[in-house]
Amino acid sequence: MVSEPIEAAGKDAQVAFPGFRLLGALLGASAERIAKDRSSFGPLLETFVFSEVLKQASWFGESCALYHYRDKDQDEVDLVIETGSGALVGIEVKASATVNAGDFKGLRKLADACGDNFKLGVVLCDGGRPVPFGDRLVAAPMSCLWA
């Protein structure tokens, strides 16, 4: 099920690799390599979050679909969860401990496009505790995936 506002705003295909360990092995990623060149860490972290959300979605109790969102201006949201009833949650993944208002740009655009169906936008980061960034927007630590 795809919400009309998502289609109209520009849902774009993105390949999500189902196993971040396998992806890391294929890319030759190691702690040493990532420490020297962090450019591969962001995509690995996004894949890890996608895998965790996919696992948890299997026991959610309501059907849901996972998407990547990109609009005509190339603003994006790493992961959009849409329930069978049309509720939407956007997740942006940041490989950083610091978050600023600009990190919510794609989530704000998704919220505007989807109106009341948009329930929450989260920037997952390496921070310590949740911090509100406006109406239905919050920065939260990665550990919230298991809370």
Locate each region found by the language model:
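Arginine/glycine-rich "motif VI" loop of SF2 helicases in the C-terminal RecA-like domain
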Residues: 58-59, 109-117
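Active-site ExK catalytic segment of metal-dependent nucleases
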Residues: 89-98
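Domain-level recognition of nuclease-like catalytic cores that cleave nucleotide substrates
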Residues: 126-147
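Low-complexity, glycine/alanine/valine/leucine- and proline-rich hydrophobic stretches
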Residues: 81, 89-90, 105-109
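Active-site-adjacent loop/helix micro-motif of nuclease/hydrolase catalytic cores
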Residues: 97-107
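Accessory nucleic acid-recognition modules appended to NTPase machines
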Residues: 1-88
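Short, hydrophobic beta-strand segments that form beta-sheet elements in well-ordered domains
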Residues: 119-125
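Switch/connector loops and helix/strand junctions flanking conserved nucleotide-binding motifs
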Residues: 25-26, 100-101, 130-134
